[in-house]
């Protein structure tokens, strides 16, 4: 990493690594999707959202710069977002990218992302990807604080460390925090009554952990190209011993059958409405839509021309 937390090569590697990982994890994540709507599409929706970020970066000429790459990542995710999980993830990615552009360290960027994702939902629910975002952010903060000054993210001295070394340290702290998140997944999910009754983990939390694992790999390898390893999903890797996105922890739940998903009735006759609206004078849009739908999320961003939009 040549500049701050995320430079252009790492942003590109992260987006593509997350896309590959979610593509491989999609069916397992879909299978445990019972909240907010039991429609078995969280894995698919988060994959499409991340694919939009990767496509936006592909459309950007190499060497466009860190700020342009981060803006493209955020905008691509926003405009491609599908479903409530995709909208929330797009807001998370946008807030993280924005914090990175502003020079934030890893703990600050993840805390900003967690707060931004929660703000996207008019009725935030604990026990979901929103809670997992906060758990990982806190674990990163605690992990960074435990590293001696100048030797880890979250401390002023890290800004003086050469970029690749700082990225390695950020990757190590994030990887450790993701271990905490995976270890807390059952407990976090059990905090939500629907998930507790269905005895499943939250699908959105699973997707977020996969996306952040891809970030840890991208940071650890500074955006270098990858080669796959059996049983894993390749991230941006240059050596056989380099880290991979591990999906073995994901639940192996059965696909929905008939009218039930993990024992929860599949919502009948549901209609999903997605819209990208120009303009920013819509401060009460989420509240007004909340009274009309089961799962509402509204995210603000900018279009390709820099104009304000809401999705």
Where is each model-derived feature located?
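N-terminal loops that bind phosphate or other acidic moieties
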Residues: 1-311
């Amino acid at each position: 990493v040549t500049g701050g937390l995320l430079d252009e090569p790492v942003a590109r590697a992260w987006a593509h690594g997350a896309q590959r990982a979610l593509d491989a994890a999609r069916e397992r994540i879909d299978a445990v999707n019972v909240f907010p709507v039991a429609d078995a599409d969280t894995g698919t929706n988060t994959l499409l959202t991340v694919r939009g970020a990767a496509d936006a970066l592909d459309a950007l000429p190499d060497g466009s710069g860190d700020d342009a790459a981060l803006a493209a990542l955020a905008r691509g995710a926003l405009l491609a977002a599908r479903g409530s999980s995709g909208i929330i993830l797009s807001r998370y990615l946008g807030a993280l990218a924005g914090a990175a552009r502003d020079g934030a360290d890893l703990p600050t960027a993840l805390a900003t992302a967690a707060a931004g994702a929660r703000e996207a939902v008019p009725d935030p629910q604990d026990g979901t990807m929103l809670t997992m975002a906060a758990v990982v952010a806190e674990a990163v903060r605690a992990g960074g604080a435990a590293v001696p000054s100048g030797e880890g993210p979250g401390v002023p001295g890290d800004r003086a460390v050469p970029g690749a070394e700082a990225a390695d340290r950020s990757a190590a702290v994030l990887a450790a925090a993701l271990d905490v998140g995976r270890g807390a997944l059952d407990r976090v999910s059990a905090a939500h009554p629907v998930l507790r009754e269905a005895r499943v983990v939250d699908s959105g939390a699973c997707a977020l952990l996969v996306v952040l694992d891809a970030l840890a790999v991208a940071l650890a390898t500074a955006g270098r190209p990858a080669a796959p390893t059996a049983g894993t999903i390749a991230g941006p890797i240059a050596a056989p011993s380099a880290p991979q996105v591990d999906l073995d922890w994901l639940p192996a739940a059965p696909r929905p059958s008939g009218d039930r998903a993990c024992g929860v009735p599949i919502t009948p006759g549901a209609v999903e409405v997605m819209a990208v609206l120009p303009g920013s004078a819509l401060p009460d849009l989420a509240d007004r839509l909340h009274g009309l739908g089961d799962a509402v999320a509204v995210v603000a961003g900018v279009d390709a021309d820099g104009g304000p939009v809401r999705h």
